[in-house]
Amino acid sequence: MKGLYIKSYGCQMNVYDSLIMENIIKPLGFTVVSEPSEADVVILNTCHIREKASEKLYSELGKIRKIQENKDLTIVVAGCVAQAEGEEIFERSPFVDIVVGPQSIHTLPELLVKAHRIKKQVINIDFPVISKFDAIPVEEYTKNQETSAFISVQEGCNKFCTFCVVPYTRGEEYSRTVEAIFNEALVLADSGIKEITLIGQNVNAYHGTYKGCEWDLGKLIQHIAKIPNIERIRYTTSHPRDMHQSLYEAHKLEEKLMPFVHLPVQSGSDRILKKMNRKHTAEEYIDIISHLRKQRPDIAFSSDFIVGFPGETEEDFENTIKLVEKVKFSQAYSFKYSPRPGTPGAEYPNQVPEEIKSERLLRLQKLLREQQLAFNRSMIGETCTVLFSSKKGKFDNQIIGKTAYMQSCYINTDNPSQFYNSISPIKIIDAHQNSLTGVVC
């Protein structure tokens, strides 16, 4: 058997795509290996959201080239950097054999055979998103997923935020049919999956069809919830502009839908939000949060923030702080703005100096960490349901599960295997910055 090594960067969609690539390549006589030095094919499934992601790719390629010098090794660059940079990757790293975009991954077996046969570099960065889903049997999406699984319901983006490359690397919005998604969920349920996360670049923009009628995400969630063996449903990543009544109702009515929403806001300044082309205000975002809390009082939120967007003043940044103080997030992701080539933001004047961006990021992250710790500590003494896989902690008798709020929860037990792939009531006895400690009830 030949060795296959895949390294995935970035979002959940890349994790999902990496699993697909693994499953469609293994029938060619490959087995997955844990180190690139053991591989005959190395795939780097890249992200292009942040500047450092590209830097990480070329740094990793430099390391893998040293392996290639001593063995016959095929190097594949996949994902959004592949889509954005295309032939430039061959120019910067001429030892790379294949470049394939995220909507062309279904052609990888053919590309591997072609590259081996003609001994030349090959590239496919087309946008055949529909043929991508049509070309890959549902079984290939669902293999090797243990307790939780992703289902891609929507890909691409039509929002064109001025800081973001996704519309250029993933293409326009496309929604899969209800039947295709439901069939995939059925296969996952039959394989023992307990939790499904519906994913998309703008997942709540989902508008798939069922028997000639258009469905939204809220209706899709309630349909999937009818599958008996599926006990938890999540969705990510959503956009404030695409929140809708049906989704609010799903949070109110469907117990299987977890009380946790990742809803990126990016900034608390209306002026900056307008420059970002977000097409919502800070107050509209807060109204969405309030409405969701009315529907589901125990709901919690995470978000994304960008500090130092071009032209951001101290007053703009303080408005972001005020929004964070008002919402109170259970967790969040925050970054310094980095110009992405080809986006409008990269051409804006008044780029914020790096030292100011760093100082603001530290202030924001301090507040976000305080809120996360406070939320975790509020769980002490509570009994919550925890979904366990077979993931172990640092010690032989320790296993790790996941709460409804995506917190890691550690328990000690003499028989860890009894909890594998199960949901159990756990009493929380301690809380830390990024995790909880519990005991079996």
UniProtKB/Swiss-Prot annotation:
Name used for this protein in its record: tRNA-2-methylthio-N(6)-dimethylallyladenosine synthase
Parts of the chain that traverse the membrane: none
Entry EC no(s): 2.8.4.3
Main location group: cytoplasm
Record-stated family: Belongs to the methylthiotransferase family. MiaB subfamily.
Function: Catalyzes the methylthiolation of N6-(dimethylallyl)adenosine (i(6)A), leading to the formation of 2-methylthio-N6-(dimethylallyl)adenosine (ms(2)i(6)A) at position 37 in tRNAs that read codons beginning with uridine.
Keyword Transferase assigned: yes
NCBIfam families xrefs: miaB-methiolase, MiaB/RimO family radical SAM methylthiotransferase
Top enzyme class: transferase
Molecular-function GO term, any one: metal ion binding
Complex formation: Monomer.
Binding site for [4Fe-4S] cluster 1: C11, C47, C80
GO cellular component terms, semicolon-separated: cytosol
